[in-house]
């Protein structure tokens, strides 16, 4: 009798735990996908149709590690709530995701292991890197795209960025926005985002007072944008992306003072 009661209580606890996690179904799908990828990692040599003359005796190296992310891409969700964003990121048909979502109240939702590839960057480019999804961590901030970011939300972001930078040795220059890597189609995080505050903590670069800066006569602003990292397929979009990030300005064109800022960067 006691044994049956114990089984019943265990089953009840398990049912209660699952039934009270609103994401239990999608969490199960997540774990199933991880198992499938784990099987691929254990496959030696890789099964393919190349017809390679593989050695009869497989020799596996003892020197290996997991690939680590080298960029952090910051987004705003452009949705009305964290709940709406989490729903979007758990629907297979949307094909979009992010490693982290930070809600307005500072709550952090870690949706995907840092070492796995999220679908957050899309078609993008930064410097010579064209597949940002494969080399970055995506962080979505709960924000409708027009409002300011809450203090508690930014505090959580700073704590997270500090952990990521230390864990993966991410270079200071590689903390950027979605609007930087895809300026023709994205504008996030919006111009209210506190990039200067992040730069003061070594999550990105900033500029000094440009009052006494003198531009060289041969200064090429397009070449400078390219050096910073922008894709110049659409120069107007690249300029707006640069101004949004460093000048909190979304207008086109560059005046003399703005060129000085670009020169410093």
What are these regions (language model features)?
Residues 6, 130-132, 258-259:
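Juxtamembrane/interface motifs at transmembrane-helix termini
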Residues 26-170:
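Active-site-adjacent loop/helix surface patches within enzyme catalytic domains
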């Amino acid at each position: 009798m006691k044994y049956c009661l114990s089984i019943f209580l265990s089953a009840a606890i398990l049912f209660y735990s699952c039934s009270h996690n609103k994401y239990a179904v999608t969490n199960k799908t997540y774990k199933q996908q991880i198992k499938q990828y784990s099987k691929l990692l254990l496959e030696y040599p890789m099964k393919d149709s190349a017809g390679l003359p593989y050695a009869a005796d497989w020799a596996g190296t003892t020197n290996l590690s997991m690939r680590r992310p080298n960029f952090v891409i910051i987004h705003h969700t452009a949705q009305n709530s964290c709940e709406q964003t989490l729903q979007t990121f758990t629907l297979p048909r949307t094909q979009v995701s992010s490693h982290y979502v930070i809600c307005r109240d500072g709550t952090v939702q870690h949706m995907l292991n840092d070492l796995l590839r999220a679908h957050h960057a899309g078609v993008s480019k930064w410097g010579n890197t064209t597949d940002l999804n494969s080399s970055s961590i995506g962080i979505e901030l709960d924000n409708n795209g027009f409002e300011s970011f809450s203090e508690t939300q930014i505090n959580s972001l700073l704590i997270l960025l500090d952990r990521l930078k230390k864990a993966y040795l991410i270079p200071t220059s590689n903390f950027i926005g979605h609007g930087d890597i895809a300026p023709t189609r994205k504008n996030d995080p919006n111009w209210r985002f506190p990039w200067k505050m992040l730069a003061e903590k070594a999550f990105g670069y900033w500029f000094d007072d440009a009052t006494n800066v003198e531009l060289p006569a041969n200064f090429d602003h397009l070449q400078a944008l390219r050096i910073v990292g922008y894709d110049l397929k659409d120069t107007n979009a690249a300029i707006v992306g640069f101004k949004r990030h460093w000048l909190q300005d979304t207008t086109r064109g560059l005046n003399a003072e703005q060129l000085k800022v670009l020169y410093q960067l």
